[in-house]
Amino acid sequence: MAEKGYIRRVIKQASFEKLSSTINAAHERSGKSKLAIFLDMCWCLARYGAGYYDYLIFRFYDLTPAQRKTYITRFISKKFNMYMNDVNYCDLFDNKDEFYERFAEFTGRSFLDLSKATAEDVAKFCEGKERIFCKPRSKTCGIGCMRLNVADFESAEFFFNDPAATEIYTIEDVIVNHPDVRKLYDNAVNSMRIITLLDANKEVHVLYMVQKIGLNGSIIDNNCMFSPVDPETGKIKYPAHAGDTPLGIVYEVHPNTGITIQGYQLPCVKEAIAMVKKAALVVPQVRYVGWDVAVTPNGPIIIEGNTYCAHDFWQLPPHTPDKIGMIPT
C-alpha cells in the first residue's frame, strides 16, 4: 500500500512543464519524434518504474529492453529503500544533532545544537575560530548551509535574534580537506559518497562510491560534479558528470583548477571504506545508507549519512560505457 501511495503522489505532483522540457531534450538528443518519446516514456514508467528524468539522464531512448532492465530507476530505488530502512530509525540520520551524537566516533569535529545552547555557549564555541559552518536541522542536499566568518557577526546573539539565522540549527567546525583533495577544488569539502548495504548476516557491503567535487565558487559539493571511484586503487574512474544530471555535462578537466579528473589519485580510500563499514553497524535497522565522507589531513571523517540514496550516481552514460545499470551489481 505504501508503494502504491508513493506512485500516486509522484504522478499527482508531476510537472507538465518539466515533463515537456524533458521530452524536448530527449527529442533533441535522440532525433526521435516527441510523440514517440512520450509513448516510450509511458511504457518505461509502466514496465521499469522509470520517471521522465530517469528516461533522460540514463538515455533510455538509446537502450534495449535487456539493458533497461538492469537500471535502478526511481520507483525501484524507493521500493528498495522502504524495504531496507526502518522509517522509525531514519530520524537518527536525518536530524543533524541526533546523527552527530550517535556517530560521534566518526564525525571528527565539534558541533553545537542551538536549540539547547545559550549565547554564552555559542561565544565559547566560536572562541579561537575564524570560521564556522552552519546547517539547518533536517534539510538535505546542502540546502540552507552557510559558512560564516566569526568576525562578521558582532555577538553570539546573532544566532538567536537575527532573521538571517532563523534556519540555523547546528553550528560546527569547518572541515579542512586533505591537500590532495583540496587540489581538486579548494572552496568546498569535496566529499566521497559511499553506499553501504547491511545484509541479513550483518555483513556490510560497499555497493559503490563516487567523488563529489565543488565548482564555480560553491561552498558545497552538491549539484556540482562527481565521478565513480575505484575502491581498490582509490583512483577516479571516469570524467566527472554534472551534479545537475539532466544537463548531461561532462568534465574531463575541472574548469576552475585545471585538474584532469579521470585517473586522479584520492587519499585514504581504504581507510574511508573501513570507517563506513564500521559505522553501518551502529544503527542496524537502517541497512542502506549513503555516507558522505570527507578526507582531512588527519584521515577520513563522516559528514552525514543519507537514508535515501541517489540512484543516478553510478548509472549515468559517461560512467556506464557498457550500458548496464546497477541491478546486476
Protein language model features and the residues they cover:
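Internal hydrophobic scaffold segments of catalytic domains
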Residues: 1-54, 197-234, 301
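Acidic carboxylate-rich catalytic motifs and surrounding loops in phosphoryl-/glycosyl-chemistry enzymes
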Residues: 113-117, 211, 289-292
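Conserved N-proximal alpha/beta basic substrate-recognition cap immediately N-terminal to
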Residues: 9-124, 140, 276
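Short, solvent-exposed loop/turn segments at secondary-structure junctions
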Residues: 138-141, 176-177, 201, 211-215, ...
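Active-site nucleotide/adenylate-binding loops and adjacent lid/helix of ATP-dependent enzymes
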Residues: 82-201
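C-terminal active-site "lid" helix and adjoining low-complexity regulatory extension at the edge
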Residues: 249-277, 281-288, 295-329
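ATP-dependent carboxylate/phosphate-activation module, predominantly the ATP-grasp catalytic core
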Residues: 184-185, 189-272
